[in-house]
Amino acid sequence: MALNLSKKKTIVSKINQISNLALSAIIANSQGISVNKINELRKSGREIGVKMSIVRNTLLSLAIENTAFKCLKKKLKGSTFIAYSTKHPGSGARLFKEFEKKNKKFKITGAVFEGKLLSELEINQLADMPTYEEAIRKLLLTLKISIAGKLIYTLSAIKEKKETS
């Protein structure tokens, strides 16, 4: 479907606005994936604050020109599906990694975090990064275990002191 100039400008403007608000971005080649599967992925993304779109490479290239994601331009080939993480930096990467495991035709081609193009290993690390809530939960659990351990140690020391007296 041919797009007129005003529609193209609208798309570029919209992608540029999202790019300026996003914490990270990840792109993948979605060629060969059914529309139903893509729609399921988009639905999952909306639930966790990931904005996704399939955009022509030339329009995407223009939209990310003056943003932290301009280094993605080198990776724009084929059918590009881009996801921006707006709430947690690893959300999009985690979502795409899970989808890639289930769909062999879906290939992650690049990602950017804090203006840096990430390697495959770094993309995996970004996907594995805990969310804010998960990190707080782990911290509280560690503190709880630490406090409980100190209490047990103190009680056993008091018990030993009473037994020796």
Swiss-Prot record:
The keyword Phosphoprotein is assigned to this record:
no
Q: Name one GO cellular component term.
A: large ribosomal subunit
Short name of one Pfam family: Ribosomal_L10
What keywords were assigned to this record?
A: Ribonucleoprotein, Ribosomal protein, RNA-binding, rRNA-binding
Molecular function GO labels: large ribosomal subunit rRNA binding; structural constituent of ribosome
Q: Which domain of life is it from?
A: Bacteria
Among InterPro entries, the record links this protein to: Ribosomal_uL10, Ribosomal_uL10-like_sf, Ribosomal_uL10_bac, Ribosomal_uL10_bac_type, Ribosomal_uL10_CS_bac
GO BP term (any one): translation
Q: Would I find Transmembrane helix among this entry's keywords?
A: no
Q: Which family does it belong to?
A: Belongs to the universal ribosomal protein uL10 family.
Subunit: Part of the ribosomal stalk of the 50S ribosomal subunit. The N-terminus interacts with L11 and the large rRNA to form the base of the stalk. The C-terminus forms an elongated spine to which L12 dimers bind in a sequential fashion forming a multimeric L10(L12)X complex.
Function, as annotated: Forms part of the ribosomal stalk, playing a central role in the interaction of the ribosome with GTP-bound translation factors.
Its protein name is Large ribosomal subunit protein uL10
Species, as recorded? Buchnera aphidicola subsp. Schizaphis graminum (strain Sg)
What are the leading ranks of the lineage?
Bacteria, Pseudomonadati, Pseudomonadota, Gammaproteobacteria, Enterobacterales
The gene designation is: rplJ
